[in-house]
């Protein structure tokens, strides 16, 4: 038909163009179908709905950015509120109330140091007081002296976030032992003499307590980083009837070798009397901080076996005092090694499970140590001598090891030595007094009152 109007050649060109147009149109339709399937047209079936879905997808990124911005803004506002809200502990600067109000009193460097006025008749004064105050006897019953356990820590918070928590565990542990054994306890937070800071702070405190409590027969000093791990062990008081100072140690290491770790002053017993005042006066001169302590440290390092170079400490000074003046003091000093009045944690803590399996409380020695002492961990300081994680984990284990002996009286125990959680180990009963206390800690014989008088 086209040949009639355009001629053969022109008609062929038009027919070819129509065929190409059909192909182009078909390709266009296929492209639209594919694109609609890819962007979700099949979900809704109408262009308007497809457009809405596309817009919603494109808007997500903006929404996320706006939410992050809003969250950041809210977090900043909360932080700002914590810093400005007077009721918030988080934003409070603790240094505002910890700052010392007055400078330390300066001491005369030319004046010899003294713990206090010289007292030479304390035995007579004390005997008179005890006679005039019969309701405060120095012995609760025969072979059971009145004992005051003394411990303490810095008047300021610890220098790390968890130190005070471990101090709390430590004093709770000591309270438990003292309650079971009829021992009084004194916790000190005051630095009584600024010159005797650090290792030496215990000496002025001990002297003051001995003089203020003549009814106390033995004062038991115990460092804050030491814990009781045998709640059932009662000290063999009869063994010490002729001694005035009891420390964990070995005679040969102190008197023969002059080894600076031949004894430990982290846990010791001191009998109240003139002898105690005299040895405190002899012990103290190396303690004043500054040049005296530094120079004394050099002497101790030179004279004592294997001692590192550092300022004078109370333990090294005691070793030096006993080794160089054995004739004066040695007869009244008992170096105890039959049980752990002090037990170095490094050789004990990994054996707790073995002890539980094979032994029982009440032994006090390597089989079930009375005291586990975390020497060098310094849980209240910024840095210790051992990895922090190991120290804290093992302090938790030591606390739980001792605490289990308390909890078992009431039917509970820790899930494990590493766990704060507890579990029930016996069922409740309507006859609770029929329960048999296997360790004998609920009503121990060593706590029974003496009613003979």
Which residues are covered by each model-predicted region?
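Juxtamembrane luminal stem/stalk of type II transmembrane Golgi/ER carbohydrate-processing enzymes
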Residues: 1-166, 383-453
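GT-A fold catalytic core of metal-dependent nucleotide-sugar glycosyltransferases
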Residues: 2, 192-193, 198-277
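Beta-strand elements of modular eukaryotic interaction domains
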Residues: 125, 136-140, 174-176, 209-210, ...
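Short, solvent-exposed loop/turn segments at secondary-structure junctions
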Residues: 154-156, 192, 226-227, 251-253, ...
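Short, flexible/disordered intra-domain loops and linkers
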Residues: 155-166, 195-196, 298-309
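Short, acidic, metal-binding catalytic loop of nucleotide-sugar glycosyltransferases
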Residues: 168-183
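A structural preference for short, hydrophobic beta-strand core positions in alpha/beta folds
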Residues: 185-187
């Amino acid at each position: 038909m086209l040949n009639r109007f355009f001629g053969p050649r022109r008609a062929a060109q038009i027919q070819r163009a129509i065929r190409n147009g059909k192909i182009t149109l078909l390709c266009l339709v296929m492209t639209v179908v594919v694109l609609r399937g890819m962007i979700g047209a099949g979900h809704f079936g109408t262009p308007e709905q497809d457009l809405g879905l596309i817009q919603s997808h494109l808007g997500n990124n903006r929404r996320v950015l706006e939410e992050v911005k809003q969250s950041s803004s809210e977090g900043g506002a909360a932080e700002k509120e914590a810093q400005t809200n007077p009721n918030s502990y988080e934003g409070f600067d603790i240094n505002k109330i910890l700052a010392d109000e007055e400078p330390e009193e300066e001491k005369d460097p030319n004046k010899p140091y003294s713990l206090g006025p010289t007292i030479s008749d304390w035995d007579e004064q004390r005997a008179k007081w005890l006679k005039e105050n019969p309701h405060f006897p120095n012995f609760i019953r025969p072979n059971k002296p009145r004992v005051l356990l003394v411990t303490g820590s810095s008047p300021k918070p610890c220098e790390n976030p968890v130190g005070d928590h471990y101090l709390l565990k430590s004093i709770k542990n000591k309270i438990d032992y003292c309650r079971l054994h009829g021992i009084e306890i004194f916790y000190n937070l005051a630095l009584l003499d600024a010159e005797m800071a650090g290792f030496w702070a215990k000496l002025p405190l001990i002297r003051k307590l001995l003089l203020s409590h003549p009814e106390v027969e033995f004062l038991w000093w115990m460092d804050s980083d030491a814990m009781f791990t045998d709640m059932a062990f009662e000290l063999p008081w009869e063994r010490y009837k002729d001694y005035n100072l009891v420390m964990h140690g070995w005679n040969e290491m102190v008197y023969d070798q002059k080894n600076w770790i031949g004894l430990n002053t982290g846990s010791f017993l001191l009998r109240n009397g003139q002898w105690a005042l005299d040895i405190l006066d002899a012990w103290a001169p190396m303690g004043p901080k500054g040049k005296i302590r530094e120079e004394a440290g050099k002497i101790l390092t030179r004279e004592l076996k294997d001692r590192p170079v550092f300022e004078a400490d109370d333990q090294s000074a005691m070793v030096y005092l006993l080794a160089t003046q054995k004739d004066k003091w040695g007869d009244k000093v008992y170096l105890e090694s039959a049980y752990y009045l002090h037990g170095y944690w490094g050789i004990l803590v990994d054996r707790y499970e073995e002890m539980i399996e094979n032994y029982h409380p009440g032994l006090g020695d390597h089989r079930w140590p009375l005291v586990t002492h975390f020497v060098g961990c310094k849980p209240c300081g910024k840095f210790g001598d051992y990895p922090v994680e190991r120290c804290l984990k093992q302090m938790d284990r030591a606390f739980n090891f001792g605490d289990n002996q308390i909890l078992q009286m009431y039917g509970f125990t820790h899930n494990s030595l590493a766990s704060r959680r507890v579990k029930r180990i016996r069922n409740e009963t309507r006859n609770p007094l029929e329960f048999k206390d296997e360790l004998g800690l609920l009503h121990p014989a060593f706590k029974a009152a003496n009613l003979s008088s």
